[in-house]
């Protein structure tokens, strides 16, 4: 099991991540996003739009405030899109999304 918060910080520092539900939707529609993560308090209509994209989607188990803090930001983040993971392990979440046990 990866440390999601640490992987997020690493991805933001060494890769390319866009914050916010609108930007995440936009990059998901364009096909740029490799992974989308949304907070537990992300509005349901936004979650439905994100899940309808052909991009893996991960439900962060805490609030937007906590997701923002995990990203090193002083504000809530409802959703984010990983465009380039950089040196992080964030893409290991794909195994969880697909239901494959981590080794």
From Swiss-Prot:
Gene3D superfamilies associated with the record: 3.30.1330.30
GO cellular component term, pick one: cytosolic large ribosomal subunit
BP GO annotations: translation
Pfam families referenced in this protein's UniProt entry, alphabetically: Ribosomal_L7Ae (PF01248)
Gene Ontology MF annotations: RNA binding; structural constituent of ribosome
Protein family per UniProt: Belongs to the eukaryotic ribosomal protein eL30 family.
Protein name: Large ribosomal subunit protein eL30
